Amino acid sequence: MKGLKEFRRKVGDFDLFSVPDYLNSLSINPDKLPYSIRVLVENLLHSVDGFLVREEDVKNVANWKPKPEEVEIPFMPVRVVLQDFTGVPVIVDLAAMRDAMVELGGDPDRINPIVQSDLVIDHSVQVDYFGTSYAYEWNTKLELERNRERYQLLKWAQKAFNNFRVVPTGTGIIHQVNLEYLAKVAYVKDGVVVFDTLVGTDSHTTMINGLGVLGWGVGGIEAEAVMLGQPYYMLLPEVVGVKLVGELREGATATDLVLTITEVLRKKGVVGKFVEYFGPALENLSVPDRATIANMAPEYGSTCGYFPIDQRTLEYLRGTGRDEELVKLVEIFAKEQGVFWTPNSPEPEYSEVIEINLSDIEPSVAGPRRPQDRIPLKELKKAFYVSLEKDFGKKFENGSEIRHGSVVIAAITSCTNTSNPSVMIGAGLLAKKAVERGLDVKPYVKTSLAPGSRVVTDYLKMSGLLPYLEALRFHVVGYGCTTCIGNSGPLPPNVEKEIKEGDLVVSAVLSGNRNFEARVHPLVKSNFLASPILVVAFAIAGKVDIDFENEPLGYDPNGQPVYLRDIWPSQREIREYIERFLKPELFREKYARVFEGDEFWRNLEVKEGKTFEWDPNSTYIRKPPYFDNFTLDVVPPDDIKGAYVLVMAGDSVTTDHISPAGSIHPESPAGKYLIERGVKPSDFNSYGSRRGNHEVMMRGTFANVRFRNYLFEEEVRGWWTIYIPTGEKMSIYDAAMRYKENGIPLIILAGKEYGSGSSRDWAAKGTALLGVKAVIAESFERIHRSNLVGMGVLPLQFKDGQNVKSLKLTGFERYDVLGIRDIHPRKTLKVIAHKDNGERVEFEVIARLDTPVEVEYFKHGGILPYVLRKIYNGEI
């Protein structure tokens, strides 16, 4: 074991590296540091090797101040978690690296995960069937037919790579499986107890912060580097303390709390910062409540949303069937390291403190387009009418059964909420009371229940609540992300027909964490996040324009009105059900054989070998071009000259706009590519499922049907651009290929919050493969900026107060970016935009290569070439 040996101590049967002893040696009061910073100190303290982690790095973290210096630090997670949408391309890349190593004359076994890596298959199941007892079976059958090639790759990887495990499909959602089973809180490594830390290839990896485990989402490219033993590099963050006081009142849920926190913190601005929760209300928040709050850290913009280890942590570990030895180890270790929170713990120093009173939380939803746009439930009806006119230019008309505001999708989905027994039991109790009063869901509502683990189904069955959910057509449709990530499946044909013919603004209500435009379903423009309890209520109401306080949900068989308050479960009822039916044995039983899979997985045949056998006819898995013509020599980047703008984007362009995860339109470039190869539109599957095929993903870049390219004066959405040399309108992919043929570099112009949303590495990979050399934006979301660097694309930020509009840029200029040759972190570069009439617009931008290692990645053409050269040269 590495580490600063003088701080290694014996505790029982194990050793540890003492954070309090180390901090005291520097005359630093441990209690003054935020808990998350103390965890970072321990992470580096046990990782010091003088090369990847230096003693100076540990000191830099230990000397954290509320306004920290701009200093780069390494982070050495002990685990990596992956889901299959982002995990398949990671495995494809590692397989391609093995091929490249063979071509260089090296040993392919040297390309191997060093860090324990677990992949959970959860992103592929779609809701094709719903509302019946056979929905799960039929959806699973379709999933396996569509994804056989991808699953063969993953099963090959499970056998070919060390330290790599796969949780097969039909088990649960990555973050819930991590919370309920994979996470240890204290991790034994080489006889030394260390903090369980991780990165994940999904932005909601932060959910594990609710268990006191530090971790967050990174791009697939960065995850690969961590898997191969590289640190994750970051700037020492500010830590915003969120003081929680009070107690949730009757009728308010953890979902309402997290939507409020998301609203408050988004307005405050916490991008790139740690958020750490403290205060007396921690005693009243269970780990599932905390996990719900931590899950949505990407939505409020922070790197993480950390809760310290405390008595609630230990209760949850016991309640989920973890070994008593582990629970005791966690308690001893956390107390020895001075990070075990109690109500009497001293308050650390924070960069800023924001207080939130739980007593003020009221029932809420968020929407119709962004998670941070919270609407109190009592104001939703009015808010929807305002949005209808303002956002969609329509006026409400009370016409046929399906109209503006009709709920056509009601989905109990996502690890955000299905991991929380209080809201799941609550949904079951509301369903029970609704059925007992003779209520039903409206016939045009597509209902679904997609638990994040099989434990949920078991306790709903044992409690007798599942039959009531099924009576309202909330049958289990699968164990995966489903509607939350756009795998909502088709709407019934008659519903689709009415929406299209009436050009209707219909709604989805889901218990997920994201509601970006066109994410849930291309025809559903208005999407609201809500607790599972409210999802059931909206399915019964059949519309979002309802005042629940004054309008009935429906009428019983005797014509008596039934209001939401009449069937809303009390906190006492919910607690009683949890205490009776949620037992540790449930978790032990369901996770006993978690890596074995079902009969399909066990019978799935794969060819074994150190290198993967690529199928040239596959439309799912193709060998990527990243290492074509690869050499060990580094060709440093040069200035960009004469670039054209491929895309001019607006504000808040998400990675979902850049690289959609959902359905593939038959008329899109990716759709045409698949049709040319004999794939029927009914077999397209989704973009997310085809991330192992760069040909599909290149064509899918900027192909979201709601993406707007501002090179067009009129509103044009979808995959279109203008090929500037001739003025032709053509697909973004075709234009990029024509520019490439003519040797013309490309850039992208964008507004604020470019690349927000999912940690989607294909948003950067696709951009790079289209030939884009730089993206000039007003601001970048953390993960996407990092991913661009990882793919050798230069993120450039306008100086404060400047943007496309203020500089009067049209996007039709030719651009030079000067000063790249001797680039260094955050260097100011000069941009010259040449107009057709000979005029020049000159302005400065900041190169968002934030750390020295990012400069190295950029010079090598990206993180993968950098790592491959290091491995080949024996430096890793």
What residues fall within each predicted segment?
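N-terminal amphipathic, basic-rich helices that act as targeting or association modules
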Residues: 1-142, 285-295, 299-324, 616-659, ...
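NTP/phosphate- and nucleic-acid-binding module
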Residues: 681-694, 698-729, 737-741, 796, ...
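Long, structured ligand/cofactor-binding scaffold of large enzymes
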Residues: 49-244, 256-259, 363-366, 380-381, ...
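Extracellular/luminal Protease-associated
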Residues: 274, 278-285, 513, 736-780
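Terminal amphipathic helices with adjacent charged low-complexity linkers/tails
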Residues: 76, 94-149, 277, 282-392, ...
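Acidic, glycine-rich flexible loop/linker segments
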Residues: 556-574, 581, 785-857, 875
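Mobile "lid/hinge" segments at catalytic clefts and subdomain interfaces of large enzymes
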Residues: 189-334, 425-431, 435-443, 475-590, ...
